[in-house]
Amino acid sequence: MNYGYVYDPARIAAAKERMTSAGFATSFDADRPHLKGNWERLKSLGVTMVLAQVDELKATGINRPSNEQRRGSCVLQGSGRSIVDKLNTMIADKSIVCEPTEVAAEVMYGYERKKHWSQTHPWGCQCGSCPDGLTGQDAAEFYATMGVVPRGIYGGVDLSKPNEQLAILWNNIGVPSNLLDVASNHKIICHASRTWDEYADAISAKHWGWICLPGICQAHSIDADNCCRIDGAGGHCTECCGIVVLPNGETAFIIQQSWGNAIKYPPTIQTASGPIQLRQGSYAVRQSELERLGTQVERHSCDIPTSSAF
């Protein structure tokens, strides 16, 4: 089964090198040194949770349900939603003045897939055997260097609603150039974190992001605090949309899946401040559970410059 995340260390390193050579920041720790130790500072002040769903509710009036992924487009789903959540946070805290906006990450997916398969399939893949999927760094490179497209209709191309099939089509024929022109007005700052402690600093500072793991979390495999265990095979990318302190003082990350109602995770988790209800499709994973996965992971976070206002 292909969940849509491709782990390719050489490709990840090459994308980071291209970004660095072009003057784009790639390291959260290096680019945001003032946030080093942010999560520990917040905990010392009594903070036990930082959740994207709180800002989403404040900015939009609702907590949107999970995306409805049907293909191996998880990098599209996880990265796109993290950018939307970051925009909602900026609207909620009044650091940007605009209407809540969804982004069409299909543009990123089609462009990056076409780019990486062009050598073996110069005129588009017709073999039917190539897997779906990208690395998490593919998405980061596109958003930082090319930008994102707000949902809407552009010259007859309807991006007003999610459309996985359009993203797959663009794997073959390429993304229309007018969409890349739109994207260039909305570039995103994307960082990678080297450790889960560093990532805790990013997420607790509300730099929501996407994580890519060599496994999936099963709804039936939970502990006493309703945290999920990673016990399923298959590379997968999901949004990371929060961080909490558990009753025993451990840290857990809040993850947002993109499979609609296909998997029903526990709606409530236990925290140091008592039980909290998560938005539909979200679940908690202990940091210690994530750390046991080793180095075959990617941890990305995002920020939106005010010059990229939607």
Regions of interest found by a model, annotated:
Residues 2-7, 70, 76, 80-84, ...:
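Predominantly the structural core of cysteine protease catalytic domains
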